């Protein structure tokens, strides 16, 4: 069901990053507020940079949907080694790729989800969300590249000039 839904929605929005679990950050002074305060999308939503495709639940990244920065292994491992979805979100923002959230009102229990249920602490969410590592890694990327977000989700350099991608 998961892959079928992603492929179906991708056929309707072929250039969009499609996900089954997405959230929207609240912003303050150009930076994302704490990850656990972000709003989860509860309806199908098509939008731009302020949609964060969460790796939990599945994400389909079409070819060329991410900036070429995505392959810079050393920067990824330095800035956000525990949060590939944060890295992909940033690379999608640089490319200004639309995001499409397909809301799921039920869960598919994958082997991974069952494993994590019986092995508490094995999922990255325990570190990234509950120990605030997502917040630190998002801030590390934004500080390293000298960018902030405006209220529409556009990346701006710290001197308020829009970044041309």
Q: Which role does the model predict for each range below?
A:
Residues 68, 73-165:
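C-terminal catalytic/acceptor-binding lobe
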Residues 2-73:
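Conserved catalytic core of nucleotide-sugar-dependent glycosyltransferases
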């Amino acid at each position: 069901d998961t892959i079928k839904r992603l492929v179906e929605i991708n056929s309707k929005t072929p250039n969009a990053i499609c996900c089954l679990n997405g959230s929207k950050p609240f912003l303050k002074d150009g930076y994302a507020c704490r990850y656990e305060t972000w709003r989860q999308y509860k309806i199908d939503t098509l939008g731009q940079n302020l949609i964060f495709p969460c790796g939990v639940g599945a994400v389909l990244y079409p070819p060329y949907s991410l900036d070429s920065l995505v392959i810079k292994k050393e920067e990824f491992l330095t800035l956000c080694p525990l949060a590939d979805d944060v890295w992909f979100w940033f690379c999608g923002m640089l490319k200004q790729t639309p995001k499409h959230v397909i809301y799921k009102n039920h869960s598919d229990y994958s082997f991974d989800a069952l494993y994590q249920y019986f092995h508490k602490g094995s999922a990255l969410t325990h570190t990234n969300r509950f120990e605030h590592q997502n917040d630190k890694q998002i801030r590390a990327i934004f500080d390293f590249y000298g960018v902030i977000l405006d209220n529409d989700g556009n990346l701006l350099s710290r001197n308020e000039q829009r970044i041309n991608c």
